[in-house]
UniProtKB/Swiss-Prot annotation:
GO CC annotation: plasma membrane; proton-transporting ATP synthase complex
Subunit details: F-type ATPases have 2 components, CF(1) - the catalytic core - and CF(0) - the membrane proton channel. CF(1) has five subunits: alpha(3), beta(3), gamma(1), delta(1), epsilon(1). CF(0) has three main subunits: a, b and c.
GO terms, molecular function: proton-transporting ATP synthase activity, rotational mechanism
Family, similarity comment: Belongs to the ATPase epsilon chain family.
NCBIfam families the UniProt entry points to: ATP_synt_epsi
Membrane topology: Peripheral membrane protein
Functional description taken from the UniProt entry: Produces ATP from ADP in the presence of a proton gradient across the membrane.
Gene this protein is translated from: atpC
Keyword Repressor: no
Keywords assigned: ATP synthesis, Cell inner membrane, Cell membrane, CF(1), Hydrogen ion transport, Ion transport, Membrane, Transport
Localization per record: Cell inner membrane
Protein name: ATP synthase epsilon chain
Organism: Chlorobium limicola
Keyword Translocase appears in the UniProt entry: no
Length: 88
């Protein structure tokens, strides 16, 4: 499937494994000061995360969500990496 013009690459990594790697159009994550949303073209960012729900809008227009146990979120160019202790 061709990636959307609005999509960007996201990797979600735990110490044990690569949990997710793919194209998304939006990520909503639990920052220390509240929820924040990342979309393609976002300014570079490094943010600490608290435990909570992460929501993904995938490039095929489906959605997914899961719980994380804190971590960090980095955006650079059109790539984002979410590092977390655990995902469920």
């Amino acid at each position: 499937m061709a990636s959307s013009d609005k999509a960007f690459k996201l990797d979600i990594v735990t110490p044990q494994k690569l949990f997710f790697s793919g194209e998304v159009t939006s990520v909503i994550a639990p920052g220390l000061d509240g929820l924040f949303q990342i979309m393609k073209g976002h300014a570079p960012l490094l943010a600490a995360l608290k435990s909570g729900k992460v929501r993904l809008s995938l490039s095929d227009k489906s959605e997914d969500s899961f719980q994380i146990e804190g971590g960090f979120f980095e955006v650079s160019g059109n790539k984002a990496i979410l590092l977390t202790e655990d995902v469920s």
